[in-house]
Amino acid sequence: MKFVIRHEIRGRVRVHFYQKDMSIRQADLLHYYLCTLPGVKNVRVYERTADAAVVYEGSRRCILEGIQRFSYDSERME
């Protein structure tokens, strides 16, 4: 999924997703997916702005690659 980094400090990144609007269901799917990434400690998804804040420990690169791999089509909530 395409995104841009809005703000970043060590161990925390806030990203904005390129989409017109985000439904609550999409926000829930994104939150669920981000929480499953290794090294993620906390996730906050803002559906009104299509942003997500991720607190993590470990590799920044792994987190950003994980975010990039996300797709609403491939994720399902059970």
Identify the function of each model-found stretch:
Residues 2-4, 9, 75-78:
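C-terminal low-complexity, charged extensions that often adopt amphipathic alpha-helices
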Residues 2-3, 38, 53, 65:
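Residue-level marker of intrinsically disordered, low-complexity segments enriched
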Residues 12-15, 22, 30-51, 55-57, ...:
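Short acidic amphipathic segments
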Residues 58-77:
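Charge-rich, low-aromatic oligomerization/scaffolding segments with amphipathic character
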Residues 7, 55-60:
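Noncatalytic linker/hinge segments flanking ATPase motor cores
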Residues 24-26, 64:
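Solvent-exposed, non-transmembrane alpha-helical starts
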